[in-house]
Design a protein with these regions (language model features):
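C-terminal appended segment following the main domain
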Residues: 209-225
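Cys-nucleophile CN-hydrolase/nitrilase-fold catalytic domain and related Cys-dependent amidase chemistry
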Residues: 2-80, 147, 151-173
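Short beta-strand scaffold segments in enzyme catalytic cores
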Residues: 61-63, 74-77, 106, 178, ...
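Active-site flanking residues adjacent to catalytic metal/cofactor-binding acidic residues
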Residues: 19, 121, 178
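Short Pro/Gly-enriched beta-strand edge/turn motifs at strand-loop
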Residues: 58-62, 85-92, 175-179
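Active-site catalytic loop in hydrolytic enzyme cores
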Residues: 40, 66-148, 153-162, 166, ...
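CN hydrolase (nitrilase-like) catalytic-core segments centered on the catalytic cysteine
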Residues: 43-58, 124-213
Length: 225
């Protein structure tokens, strides 16, 4: 996050969006989760926030959260080292049985623009985006992690943006997604995409497939991402 935040284009923007479970890495195994999950009220997480506090743009990034005995696939909204909101993934895939599902769709305000969050597979369910739009949200942020086995990755390669476009057409919101890319050993690959769609479901900016990078887009008159 610090590396991307140091880029000149980042400092000129209002928001930086990162992928699902970005902080600790997306690995849904009991050993990984029990070792790296973070209580958001703990000193260990506060140290991370302190380190992020000099970053000017608002940050939205995925974390593996521990709350009591439960684990959540969570996205946090961080501004100047302070947690200003969080969203817990509501539609878990079968491989995420170690997580508890969230049950709320909170929104947050950024420079007068109401934003909401869906995490990855949430976008397969129209009600998740509609719950955000019903609260007046203009922007839907989608932290994602689509590192898949090779055959599945090929089958889904063009479907991710197609599904996101459906949510945009249904709600009239802007949509920004941050996804992973590259190969993990010889069995898995992530094609992303990391992209921004306007309310007409046009892709206005996208990181090239199999390229690690970022895009910058102006969303409406007052918010850039």
């Amino acid at each position: 996050m610090e590396t991307f935040a140091r880029r000149p284009a980042s400092d000129a923007g209002d928001l930086l969006l990162f992928p699902e479970c970005f902080l600790q890495g997306y690995l849904v195994e009991s050993e990984h989760i029990s070792k790296y999950a973070l209580d958001l009220s703990a000193t260990s997480f506060q140290k991370i926030l302190d380190r992020l506090s000099p970053i000017r743009p608002t940050l939205v990034f995925g974390v593996i959260e521990q709350c009591g005995a439960a684990y959540f696939n969570t996205a946090v909204v961080v501004r100047h080292g302070m947690v200003e909101g969080l969203y817990r993934k509501t539609h878990l895939v079968p491989g995420e049985r170690l997580f508890h599902a969230g049950n709320a769709h909170p929104t947050f305000n950024l420079n007068g623009v109401t934003c909401g969050i869906n995490i990855c597979s949430d976008t397969n369910f129209p009600e998740a985006a509609k719950a955000v739009a019903a609260q007046g949200a203009r922007v839907l942020l989608v932290p994602s992690q689509n590192m898949m086995r090779l055959q599945a990755a090929e089958a889904w390669k063009c479907r991710h943006n197609a599904i996101r476009a459906e949510r945009v057409r249904e709600t009239g919101m802007w949509l920004a997604s941050a996804d992973v890319t590259g190969a993990r050993d010889e069995s898995r690959v992530g094609y992303g995409p990391t992209s921004v769609m306007n309310p007409n479901a046009d892709v206005v900016a996208q990181v090239p497939i199999m390229t690690a990078g970022m895009v910058v887009a102006e969303i409406g008159p007052t918010l850039s991402n």
